[in-house]
């Protein structure tokens, strides 16, 4: 979300309208509980959605109790409550009668459809545990892989609303094994798995799943703009400087998704250009906006910490020793905080170095980035190989010029990797 979106209620409404019914309600209530200036607007938005598109009178009543300050001149809609109570009872009885009749007649497809209708009813009412149990009973009446894929997606969606992300991944595993029969579900399945991994703090797995989501995906729970934010933050936290540059150069999906959020795109470019203070400052400026995303907010502190840690490791690569003062200037961070971060990184064995608290310096051992030294070694060996080849070719050319009919002293060169060691 951009700052303008949060200040302008019309923009906020447009943002919320991109989601499905329950996501609209849950996101609006999350904002209401975390932003006092937007509380009244978001509560009334959620109430409107509840009354128009659901039968969840329990949530409706509880919101009047929780947000009493937003309803000073409003009363509980008793007429709506009575109407919903009546129709809920009527609909539930009818759905159960139909299901029982189909089971007595052993009509398999009709049983499946009736069980789906019952599960959908529980979801509309907001009884997600009952909806989950009803959807689970549909499995035995599915007759093909496509039906199983659609069912698994519904189970994933309900599990997200409940907040059971381990179940999302379990149902996602089943969905991925049957998705070939319903290819249109591929992006939502990977998006839900990515969201579950993200909420569980497994950012690398989240990144891997999000990268398989098509850029034109639009779903009731997570939008392509959300994925752009999550994928960019995960990349900043998980990928080092070298990997990030490679992905931006070669990965079309990552480029397309990260382009959807200009602010985070600037953060990615800042990291590529080693402008770490710009990266961290930009993230901090957007922190308030991110804190109003119900899935991002709980991960924000950990993500920012990992991004800062990854940036610090990338920053230290060229150095053998460095004063805290220079790091503090380049990162716009207090020296004491720098020292604390360095000690944590070294204790976690992510950096092979030592901290001199008296001199306020950090000393980095070469082995802290062994892959870089392996790259340097390979480059040196390759350079030596080409040098030997060039020398022998030059020698052969000179030998040819100095002889008339004789064969060259060196007719061919056969340089191997072993020569580069000599």
From Swiss-Prot:
Cell compartment(s), UniProt: Cytoplasm; Nucleus
Which SMART domains does the record associate with it? PINT (SM00088)
Q: What keywords sit in the KW lines?
A: Cytoplasm, Nucleus, Signalosome
Annotated InterPro entries: PCI_dom, Rpn7/CSN1, Rpn7_N, TPR-like_helical_dom_sf, WH_DNA-bd_sf
Biological processes per GO annotation:
DNA damage response; protein deneddylation
Gene Ontology cellular-component terms listed: COP9 signalosome; cytosol; nucleus
PCI domain: which residues? 202-369
Q: Does the keyword Cell wall biogenesis/degradation apply?
A: no
Family, per entry:
Belongs to the CSN1 family.
Please give the function described in this protein's UniProt entry.
Component of the COP9 signalosome (CSN) complex that acts as an regulator of the ubiquitin (Ubl) conjugation pathway by mediating the deneddylation of the cullin subunit of SCF-type E3 ubiquitin-protein ligase complexes. Required, indirectly, for activation of ribonucleotide reductase through the degradation of the protein spd1, thereby supplying deoxyribonucleotides for DNA replication and repair.
Quaternary structure and interacting proteins, as annotated: Component of the COP9 signalosome (CSN) complex composed of at least csn1, csn2, csn4 and csn5 subunits.
UniProt protein name: COP9 signalosome complex subunit 1
* Organism this protein belongs to: Schizosaccharomyces pombe (strain 972 / ATCC 24843) (Fission yeast)
Q: What gene is this protein a product of?
A: csn1
């Amino acid at each position: 979300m951009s700052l303008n979106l949060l200040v302008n209620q019309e923009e906020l409404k447009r943002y919320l309208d991109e989601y499905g019914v329950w996501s609209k309600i849950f996101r609006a209530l999350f904002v209401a509980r975390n932003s006092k200036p937007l509380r009244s607007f978001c509560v009334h938005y959620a109430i409107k959605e509840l009354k128009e598109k659901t039968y969840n009178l329990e949530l409706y009543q509880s919101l009047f109790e929780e947000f009493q300050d937003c309803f000073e001149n409003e009363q509980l809609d008793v007429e709506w409550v009575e109407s919903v109570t009546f129709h809920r009872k009527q609909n539930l009885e009818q759905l159960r009668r139909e299901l029982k009749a189909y089971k007595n007649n052993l009509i398999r497809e009709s049983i499946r459809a009736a069980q789906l209708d019952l599960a959908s009813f529980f979801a509309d009412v907001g009884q997600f545990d009952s909806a989950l149990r009803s959807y689970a009973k549909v499995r035995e009446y599915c007759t093909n892989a496509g039906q199983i894929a659609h069912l698994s997606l519904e189970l994933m969606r309900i599990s997200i609303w409940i907040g059971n992300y381990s179940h999302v991944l379990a149902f996602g595993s089943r969905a991925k094994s049957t998705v070939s029969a319903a290819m249109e579900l591929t992006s939502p399945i990977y998006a839900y798995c990515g969201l579950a991994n993200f909420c569980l703090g497994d950012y690398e797995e989240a990144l891997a799943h999000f990268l398989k989501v098509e850029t034109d995906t639009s779903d009731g729970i997570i939008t392509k703009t959300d994925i752009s934010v999550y994928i960019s933050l995960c990349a900043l936290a998980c990928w080092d400087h070298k990997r990030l540059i490679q992905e931006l150069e070669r990965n079309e999906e990552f480029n397309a998704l990260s382009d959807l959020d200009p602010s985070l795109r600037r953060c990615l470019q800042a990291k590529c250009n080693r402008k770490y203070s710009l990266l961290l400052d930009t993230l901090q400026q957007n922190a308030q906006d991110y804190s109003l995303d119900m899935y991002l907010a709980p991960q924000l502190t950990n993500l920012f910490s990992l991004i800062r840690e990854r940036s610090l490791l990338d920053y230290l690569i060229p150095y053998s020793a460095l004063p805290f003062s220079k790091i503090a200037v380049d990162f716009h961070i207090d020296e004491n905080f720098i020292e604390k971060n360095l000690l944590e990184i070294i204790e976690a064995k992510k950096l092979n170095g030592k901290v001199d608290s008296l001199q306020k310096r950090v000393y980095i051992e070469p082995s802290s980035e062994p892959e870089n030294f392996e790259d340097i070694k390979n480059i040196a060996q390759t350079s030596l190989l080409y040098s030997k080849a060039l020398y022998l070719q030059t020698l052969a050319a000179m030998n040819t010029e100095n002889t008339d009919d004789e064969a060259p002293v060196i007719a061919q060169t056969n340089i191997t990797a072993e020569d580069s060691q000599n």
